[in-house]
């Protein structure tokens, strides 16, 4: 998980002034042994702006605490949320419209001679699939989507496709959209089809005057280029060309559905795109221009109404799940701890942005709970705990029994029991889906996670700077991607035999690449803040140690190159046609990476969850779509 802390602390022994009263403040700020706790119902809220160094009087323990802001989503606010969209009438209306759209889609197989002809039947099928997927309603049309793509693929050749099956000339828009869509659905298609759209100089060409049709073609070229596999130079060239083209187009075209779509795609791409956020955006895009993207205005209007209804119906389920999660947090020890980040609502938002299936409540809630646990443990190991306490907690996790709490300090006892109970509860839920005991999988993942934190704590304590390779090997585990992925996906209701799980979980290439990408990307955005509080180890500093004379800029450039290369390798591991694990089995693991990567577009979105992430919560969880 995104457990990297970025709070700028001056020293290892820093405790917030909220823990002390004015009469107790002396040089070095001596205070009472609160251990970061307060009475039930009274949370000590750290300030955003300052952090004081303090010493606990009774035992002389020196602690530091990051200046993380408090929980932004009060339980009373969450419990007050209400919506009418869980009523049966909305469900019935959505089901009726879904049936009507299926009839329209199935009728496309019979050309009407006007809208659907042998000269445009391929692009029309692709466009309909694309619209359905971007509106977030594709789970209702799986058979129709497969039928449409099978039809398109039957006419695919080494040069791509034209707009229709009887077109003798291939078309950039049809070929680019086809390449992207077919590849994402597991069809073996080569990027070599794009070579024919270069000029005699080997460059992608465009006309002197930008037309709407050309802009749409280049937009789909950009979208296709993001689904690149290793070694596909033409995809790299396509991405560079289309990025420049689209940025220039935004400066010249008026504000409209097309400009809004371009801006969204350039901002979120594919690896940082979240399906529910995308659906919310395209509801507005198609609402602004009902004929945008398809000639069948009747079908587009129905699809738009389905998307709005589905968004709001799921919104009613989100409220129920969020209320459960907020009560879980409020009634736990977490709400009494002042030092850690409280991001349970933000984690739930991520889960509900990548999985909107009503049957997957266990996945969404489990992901939020497990991720929040990981964040609290990160703040304990990274800042608050002493080395002796961390050794005790590490041993307790390996013992995995409630009796292990008797050796722990008071504030750790509650955290340990929440970890123990939550992991066991999720294991019982996963056992129902998998038909076998899954607790050992979870325990192994948590032990590895805690061990990686213990190693980092020792590095900080001793001032040791590891090699780049040693740091990354440990950092891939300490990021927490594995613990955030393993148990939640085992609750989905899909059986994961051992050989399938091995291609998703550790030590699979998919898991290793995801962990590497997130650790490297996280460090690029947080190393300066970590260095300011005395933490030497980061991929930046370790690279510079291994390469004397290199600068921070050199290190960042090298690591960005590693990330970009790894993203292409991850695309291949996710979509490769020869994999034993089907794409559907790997999708949640891949989407969890996209959720975390979304937070690291510009900065650590969890340590400071006030801007983009707060807006994400509001637009995808709190606020319904106007019908």
UniProtKB/Swiss-Prot annotation:
Similarity comment text for this entry: Belongs to the terpene synthase family. Tpsd subfamily.
Gene source species: Picea glauca (White spruce)
Keyword Transferase among record annotations: no
Catalysed transformations (reactions): (2E)-geranyl diphosphate + H2O = (R)-linalool + diphosphate
First and last residues of the transit peptide: 1-21
Known pathway: Terpene metabolism; oleoresin biosynthesis
Enzyme Commission number, as recorded: 4.2.3.26
Annotated Mg(2+) 3 binding sites: 530
This protein's name: (R)-linalool synthase, chloroplastic
Subcellular locations according to the entry: Plastid, Chloroplast
Biological processes, Gene Ontology terms: diterpenoid biosynthetic process; green leaf volatile biosynthetic process; monoterpenoid biosynthetic process
Lineage of producing organism: Eukaryota, Viridiplantae, Streptophyta, Embryophyta, Tracheophyta
Transmembrane segments: none
Motif DDXXD motif: chain residues: 378-382
The protein's required cofactors: Mg(2+); Mn(2+)
Main localization category: plastid
């Amino acid at each position: 998980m995104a457990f990297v802390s970025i709070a700028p602390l001056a020293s290892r022994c820093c405790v917030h002034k909220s823990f002390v009263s004015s009469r107790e403040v002396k040089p070095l700020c001596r205070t009472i042994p609160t251990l970061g706790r307060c009475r039930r119902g009274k949370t000590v809220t750290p300030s955003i702006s300052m952090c004081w160094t303090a010493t606990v009087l009774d035992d002389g323990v020196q602690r530091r605490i990051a200046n993380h802001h408090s929980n932004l989503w009060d339980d009373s606010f969450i419990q007050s949320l209400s919506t009418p969209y869980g009523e049966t009438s909305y469900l019935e209306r959505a089901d009726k419209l879904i049936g009507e759209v299926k009839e329209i889609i199935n009728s496309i197989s019979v050309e009407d001679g006007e809208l659907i002809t042998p000269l445009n039947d391929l692009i029309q099928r692709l466009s309909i699939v694309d619209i359905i997927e971007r509106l977030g309603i594709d789970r209702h049309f799986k058979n129709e989507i497969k039928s449409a793509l099978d039809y398109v693929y039957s006419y695919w050749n080494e040069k791509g496709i034209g707009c229709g099956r009887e077109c003798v000339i291939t078309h950039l828009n049809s070929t680019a959209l086809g390449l992207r869509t077919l590849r994402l659905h597991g069809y073996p298609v080569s990027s070599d089809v794009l070579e024919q759209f270069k000029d005699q100089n080997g460059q992608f060409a465009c006309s002197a005057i930008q037309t709407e049709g050309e802009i749409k073609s280049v937009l789909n070229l950009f979208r296709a280029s993001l689904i690149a596999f290793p070694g596909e130079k033409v995809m790299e060239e396509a991405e560079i060309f289309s990025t420049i083209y689209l940025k220039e187009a935004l400066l010249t075209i008026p504000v409209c559905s097309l400009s809004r779509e371009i801006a969204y795609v350039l901002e979120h791409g594919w690896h940082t795109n979240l399906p529910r956020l995308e659906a919310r955006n395209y509801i507005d895009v198609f609402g602004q221009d009902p004929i945008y993207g398809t000639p069948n205005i009747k079908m587009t209007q129905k699809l738009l109404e389905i998307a709005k209804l589905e968004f709001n119906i799921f919104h009613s389920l989100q409220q129920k799940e969020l209320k459960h999660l907020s009560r879980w947090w409020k009634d736990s020890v977490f709400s009494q701890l002042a030092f850690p980040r409280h991001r349970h609502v933000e984690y739930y938002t991520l889960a509900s942005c990548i999985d909107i299936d009503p049957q997957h409540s266990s996945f969404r809630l489990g992901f939020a709970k497990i991720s929040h646990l990981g964040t609290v443990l990160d703040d304990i190991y990274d800042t608050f705990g002493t080395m002796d306490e961390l050794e005790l907690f590490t041993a307790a996790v390996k013992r995995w029994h409630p009796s292990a709490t008797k050796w722990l300090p008071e504030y750790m006892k509650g955290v340990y029991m929440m970890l123990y109970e939550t992991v066991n509860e999720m294991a019982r839920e996963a056992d129902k889906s998998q038909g076998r005991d899954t607790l050992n999988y979870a325990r192994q993942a948590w032990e590895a996670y805690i061990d990686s934190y213990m190693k980092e704590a020792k590095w900080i304590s001793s001032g040791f700077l590891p090699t780049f390779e040693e740091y990354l090997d440990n950092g891939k585990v300490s990021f927490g991607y594995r613990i955030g992925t393993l148990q939640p996906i085992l609750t989905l209701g899909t059986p994961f035999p051992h050989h399938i799980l091995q291609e998703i979980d550790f030590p699979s290439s998919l898991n290793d690449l995801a962990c590497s990408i997130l650790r490297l990307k996280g460090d690029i955005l947080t190393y300066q803040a970590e260095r300011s509080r005395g933490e030497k180890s980061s991929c930046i500093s370790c690279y510079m140690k291994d390469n004397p004379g290199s600068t921070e800029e050199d290190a960042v450039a090298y690591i960005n190159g590693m990330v970009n290369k790894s993203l292409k390798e991850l695309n291949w591991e996710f979509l490769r046609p020869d994999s034993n694990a089907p794409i559907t089995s790997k999708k949640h693991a891949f989407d969890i990476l996209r959720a975390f990567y979304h937070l690291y577009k510009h900065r650590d979105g969890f340590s400071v969850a006030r801007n983009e992430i707060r807006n994400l919560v509001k637009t995808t969880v709190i606020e319904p779509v106007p019908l």
